Amino acid sequence: MFKTISNFMRVSDIRNKIIFTLLMLIVFRIGAFIPVPYVNAEALQAQSQMGVFDLLNTFGGGALYQFSIFAMGITPYITASIIIQLLQMDVVPKFTEWSKQGEVGRRKLAQFTRYFTIVLGFIQALGMSYGFNNLANGMLIEKSGVSTYLIIALVLTGGTAFLMWLGEQITSHGVGNGISIIIFAGIVSSIPKTIGQIYETQFVGSNDQLFIHIVKVALLVIAILAVIVGVIFIQQAVRKIAIQYAKGTGRSPAGGGQSTHLPLKVNPAGVIPVIFAVAFLITPRTIASFFGTNDVTKWIQNNFDNTHPVGMAIYVALIIAFTYFYAFVQVNPEQMADNLKKQGGYIPGVRPGKMTQDRITSILYRLTFVGSIFLAVISILPIFFIQFAGLPQSAQIGGTSLLIVVGVALETMKQLESQLVKRNYRGFMKN
């Protein structure tokens, strides 16, 4: 691993991308401690025992706990992305048309997603400031009034817009997917606090049951290792489809056709489905927390909690649904079949064109079924282990966070390796 990192740092353009990404993350961490005006964050910190608060705070790298300018994190952007991508499925004809226009269409959709993020962010900021103020018995907002709420909402929306821009800069000039890297950084920054909470609850003042607590922590370590191995396995697994190129094409050797393969990942969506599933579960619980405690809000808090049987079932269903959805966003069977036909390639025994598209679609459906089930299992595995061991809520959140951290780290390393291989290939061709 250290040798790989050393190889990355020897290449100037990759080194510059890594340094740029780290600088952007430093800016993100600084912003997490810049307070919003007219807010008494200590009043909100008193409510930190709420599970949804801990989850939001973890994904924001502690920004919500400080009620900083980045308190909303990147959640509005994730929500906007989900909605816009769902609307592309023949719901809004214009979006469907743009989705088929290649790079030009993607730019239009990305721009519309930005605008929608600002609108959602402003609405969420108003609701969050008003709701959390009620939750803190009116102690959160100083000099509460319409103008105060508007100023706070504008500052929070500006913070989310800046994070969105920061993520795009990392994607364009740094390494990895910018939004995922920001979520990754937020989670990693909360790990020391989570470890401290586990140590405090399991080992401080528990000398008479020390062995039992050691066993509990050992179970947690086993769950962590299982998640790491599981994520690596599911991210690396591919199905190779045999491809034959006809004689006389640019890919065929002088003596005739060439055989190769088309690799399809078992889980082409990565950990994006988990991020989206968590964001989907957070939203109703966050809204419910604004309205105090009653039968309805209790029902929402319980049934949208992924440690509750109903919430866990919803969580698993969302992961499977988003895995299928994103598999076909990342892999377009129609475009693949068309490209193969243009290049003179075909799957042995399958006619080029529509039949090839149907074969790729069929294989992708089967692969995604396996990938989605496996992803769902390794997502809930830490929850079972942690509940069985009786560890604190922060550890349960840490299980989901770990899945995202490992997945993002793996994808980023693969991207860096591909850039290194590409650069070495270019150097070889020049020589």
From Swiss-Prot:
Annotated TM spans: 18-38, 67-87, 116-136, 146-166, 178-198, 214-234, 262-282, 309-329, 369-389, 390-410
**Intracellular or extracellular location(s):** Cell membrane; Membrane raft
Q: So which domain of life are we looking at?
A: Bacteria
Membrane disposition: Multi-pass membrane protein
Q: List the disulfide bonds.
A: none
Cellular component GO terms, alphabetical:
cell envelope Sec protein transport complex; membrane raft; plasma membrane
Q: Which InterPro entries match?
A: SecY, SecY/SEC61-alpha, SecY_CS, SecY_dom_sf
Keywords, ordered alphabetically? Cell membrane, Membrane, Protein transport, Translocation, Transmembrane, Transmembrane helix, Transport
Q: Where is the signal peptide?
A: none
Under SUPFAM superfamilies, the record lists: Preprotein translocase SecY subunit
The segments annotated as topological domain Cytoplasmic are: 1-17, 88-115, 167-177, 235-261, 330-368, 411-431
For this entry, list what GO says about its biological process.
protein transport by the Sec complex; SRP-dependent cotranslational protein targeting to membrane, translocation
Gene Ontology terms for molecular function? protein transmembrane transporter activity; signal sequence binding
Where are the Extracellular topological domains? 39-66, 137-145, 199-213, 283-308
Q: Which HAMAP family match?
A: SecY
What does this chain do? The central subunit of the protein translocation channel SecYEG. Consists of two halves formed by TMs 1-5 and 6-10. These two domains form a lateral gate at the front which open onto the bilayer between TMs 2 and 7, and are clamped together by SecE at the back. The channel is closed by both a pore ring composed of hydrophobic SecY resides and a short helix (helix 2A) on the extracellular side of the membrane which forms a plug. The plug probably moves laterally to allow the channel to open. The ring and the pore may move independently.
What's this protein's family per the entry?
Answer: Belongs to the SecY/SEC61-alpha family.
Provide the assembly information: Component of the Sec protein translocase complex. Heterotrimer consisting of SecY, SecE and SecG subunits. The heterotrimers can form oligomers, although 1 heterotrimer is thought to be able to translocate proteins. Interacts with the ribosome. Interacts with SecDF, and other proteins may be involved. Interacts with SecA. Interacts with FloT.
Full protein name: Protein translocase subunit SecY
